[in-house]
């Protein structure tokens, strides 16, 4: 199977600031200096920041994306915008899938906010085909080890393995 291109074919919503759309803002972004980690890993981390902020404020992630894009340093890249917009567009379905795969004594609201956002990103990547399920899970687990609680990496690994099984079962 040929490798997927680095960008996705997910159509972008037109999000506007007072005078420019997110797409226009992103296109004006200068090349950033190389930093540690892959481009996709950095995009996931930045998307996590934006989704986490929106979840914390109980606001629309598109508003946070617009603010981060207009005032960003370092700039928001198209891949980050794709992740945020993709998760936002499918969030209700993603959250239902997470809830179905959680143990009976857990709820979506009980999950640490970082874990919830990481799970949403990984599931969107699995559903959209922008990353293989293995890569999406591995990246979510790696970010959980770095940014969340002690047990989060194991928790997310188990949850996302269950989600992966469900998604593969739906394809057959």
Predicted regions and their residues:
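N-terminal interaction/assembly modules
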Residues: 1-172
């Amino acid at each position: 199977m040929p490798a997927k291109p680095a960008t996705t074919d997910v159509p972008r919503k037109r999000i506007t600031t007072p005078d420019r759309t997110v797409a226009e803002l992103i296109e004006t972004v200068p090349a950033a200096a190389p930093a540690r980690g892959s481009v996709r890993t950095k995009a996931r981390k930045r998307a996590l920041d934006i989704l986490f902020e929106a979840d914390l404020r109980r606001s629309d992630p598109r508003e946070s994306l617009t603010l981060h894009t207009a005032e960003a340093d370092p700039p928001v890249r198209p891949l980050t915008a794709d992740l945020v917009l993709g998760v936002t567009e499918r969030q209700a379905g993603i959250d239902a899938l997470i809830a179905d795969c959680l143990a009976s004594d857990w709820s979506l609201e009980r999950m640490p906010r970082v874990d919830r956002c990481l799970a949403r990103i990984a599931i969107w990547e699995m559903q959209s085909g922008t990353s293989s399920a293995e890569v999406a899970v591995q990246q979510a687990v790696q970010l959980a080890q770095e940014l969340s609680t002690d047990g989060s990496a194991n928790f997310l690994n188990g949850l996302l393995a269950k989600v992966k099984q469900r998604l593969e079962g739906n394809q057959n």
